[in-house]
Amino acid sequence: MRPARAFIDLQALRHNYQLARESSGGKALAVVKADAYGHGAVRVAQALEAQADGFAVACIEEALELRAAGIRAPVLLLEGFFEADELALIVEHDLWTVVHATWQLEAIEQARLGKPITVWLKLDTGMHRVGLHPHEYQAGYQRLLATGKVARIVLMSHFSRADELNSGCSDEQLAVFETFRKGLAAETSLKNSPAVLGWPQIPSDWSRPGIMLYGATPFDQVHPLADRLQPVMTLESKIISVRELPVGEPVGYGATFVCDRPLRIGVVAMGYADGYPRHAPTGTPVQIDGQPSRLLGRVSMDMLCVDLTEVPQAGLGSRVELWGKQVLASEVAQRAETIPYEIFCNLRRVPRIYSED
C-alpha cells in the first residue's frame, strides 16, 4: 500500500475547541465545512459532539451528511439556503440557516413551514461578500419577526481583516454592526478564529472557530494564544528511493534545483495530487525520522524529493513528516505563498487515521 497517511489527533481537536470556547467567552459553533478543512467532517463532529454547542457548515449537503451520521447537535448553514425548496429540509432536519439576502427573506415569508426555524441574520459590515445592506438590516429583522415562522434570530457579521492585528478594520466593522443592530433584542455572532484569538474585547455571544480547531494559526506572526493550539493533522509518507548525486546534477522537473555540492537525495511518495502544495519551494521544511531537513526541487504529482545529506541514518522506508506536530502547516503554507486553510482543504487521496493520543 502507498505509505502516504494523514494522522488526525482527536484529543488535540478537543483541546483546540475548548481553547476557542474559553477564549471567546460565549458559546462556539465548531466550523466543519469543506469536510472539516480536510480532516473529515463526520469524524470531527462525532469527536466534538459531546463538547460542542453546535456545528457550522457551508451548505445543506454538508449538513445532511452530519445528520445521516447521527449528529443531532445544532447545525448552521453559513451560506444559508440556495433555493426556497431547501426550507422544507431545514425544517425536517432541524437545521439553522443564515439569511444574507432579501430574496431569502421573501422565501421565508412565502413558505409554509411545519414549525418555526432559527435564523442567523447577516449584516454586511464592510467585507462586501454577503449580508444585508446596513440600511436593510433593521427592516429585515422586523420582517422575520412578522412572519411568525422564526423561533429565534441571531445577529451576525464577518470580519475581513481580523488576522491583521494592527489593522483598524475590525473596530470599524464592529462600529457598523453596533450602529445598525441597535435596539434589536437578539444574541450576536461576530468572532471567527482570528477574532477569538486576537480581539478579546469584541463582544460576541456565539463564536465560529474554524482554522484554530485544526491547530493552525490564522496569523503570520507569533501570538501567545495561538501558540497554545495543538496541530491536529500530521501528514506523513515514506522514502521510496535514494540517490547519490554529484555537483551540477538537477533534481526534478524543470531543473529548478541543481546540486551545489554532492548530495544524498530521498524520493518521497507524496505530491500535489495528494494535496501537498506544488509551489512549495526548495528549502521548505520536512522532518525525516524526527530530524529536520528540506524539500529539494519541484513537487511532482505523486512524488517529491528531500535532502538526506545531513540525515545519514535515513534510507528506504524512513518516515517523512510533511506537516504536523514538528513541521507546522502554517510554515509550509507560508513557504508556498498560500494559507493553511488551503493546504488542509486540498488534501485528497490520502487515507486518514484517527487516534485519541
UniProtKB/Swiss-Prot annotation:
Sites where the protein binds substrate: 129, 301
Chemical reaction(s) catalysed: L-alanine = D-alanine
Domain of life: Bacteria
Active-site residues per Swiss-Prot or TrEMBL entry: 33 (proton acceptor), 253 (proton acceptor)
Kinase as UniProt keyword: no
GO molecular function: alanine racemase activity; pyridoxal phosphate binding
Matches recorded under Pfam families: Ala_racemase_C (PF00842), Ala_racemase_N (PF01168)
Family annotation (SMART domains): Ala_racemase_C
UniProt entry keywords in alphabetical sequence: Isomerase, Pyridoxal phosphate
Cofactor names: pyridoxal 5'-phosphate
Top-level class of the enzyme under EC nomenclature: isomerase
Protein EC: 5.1.1.1
Pathway it works in: Amino-acid biosynthesis; D-alanine biosynthesis; D-alanine from L-alanine: step 1/1
SUPFAM superfamilies: Alanine racemase C-terminal domain-like, PLP-binding barrel
Residue numbers of N6-(pyridoxal phosphate)lysine PTMs: 33
Record family assignment: Belongs to the alanine racemase family.
Function comment: Catalyzes the interconversion of L-alanine and D-alanine. May also act on other amino acids.
Name of the molecule in the record: Alanine racemase
The species this protein was found in: Pseudomonas syringae pv. syringae (strain B728a)
